[in-house]
């Protein structure tokens, strides 16, 4: 047990170094690829709780998202806004700016693919993140198709701090069987209750 725990800590530290993550981030082994990471984010971002409380939740997705970045948001009841494809092949930024204006009190999440696994188009991560954060929304980048080929940085620019990224190590050389990875800013997490109560979550349980 202790040996495996040390290996897991070393793996977390190595991933954090590669992705520019610091103490303000959590590296989470989520399970089955990026799909599991996104489903975990639905909980961590407090989406279902916000909807249950009557708060508007809007999720902005790109023109070429995988089902793993569509269905988790749709199934939780969020409003989905799909951006059109621009002439350059990425998401249409004029539509993005409009979609970010969801009204006072709304929870807005922008969830985009860093690279299309259909066209190979690579998004301008820093530019898009800058616009999203300036509007007060949360930014998720799905690197499932791009992680083996692209650099990943939680802050690609000083004014472009990404809230979360997900990727699928099973798509790397030697990666089959590896757990999906979610890296999330701790201050972006709205619901800290464990997704699955059980071993390792006892400190969250009340004595009553």
Residue ranges, per PLM feature:
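Pyridoxal 5′-phosphate
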Residues: 1-208
């Amino acid at each position: 047990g202790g040996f495996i725990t040390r290996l897991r800590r070393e793996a977390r530290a190595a991933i954090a170094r590669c992705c520019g993550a610091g103490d303000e981030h959590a590296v989470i082994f989520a399970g089955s690829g990026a799909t599991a990471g996104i489903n975990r984010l639905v909980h961590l971002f407090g989406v279902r709780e916000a909807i249950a409380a009557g708060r508007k939740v809007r999720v902005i997705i790109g023109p070429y998202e995988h089902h793993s970045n569509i269905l988790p948001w749709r199934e939780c009841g969020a409003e989905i806004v799909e951006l059109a494809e621009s002439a350059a092949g990425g998401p249409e930024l004029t539509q993005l700016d409009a979609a970010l204006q969801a009204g006072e009190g709304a929870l807005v999440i922008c969830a985009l693919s860093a690279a299309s696994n259909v066209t190979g188009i690579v998004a301008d991560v820093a530019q898009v993140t800058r616009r999203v954060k300036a509007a007060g929304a949360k930014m998720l980048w799905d690197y499932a198709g791009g992680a083996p080929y692209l650099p990943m940085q939680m802050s690609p620019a000083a004014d472009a701090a990404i809230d979360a990224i997900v990727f699928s190590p099973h798509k790397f050389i030697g990666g089959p069987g590896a757990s999906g990875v979610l890296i999330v800013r701790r201050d972006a997490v709205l619901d800290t209750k464990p997704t699955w109560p059980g071993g390792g979550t006892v400190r969250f349980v009340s004595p009553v």
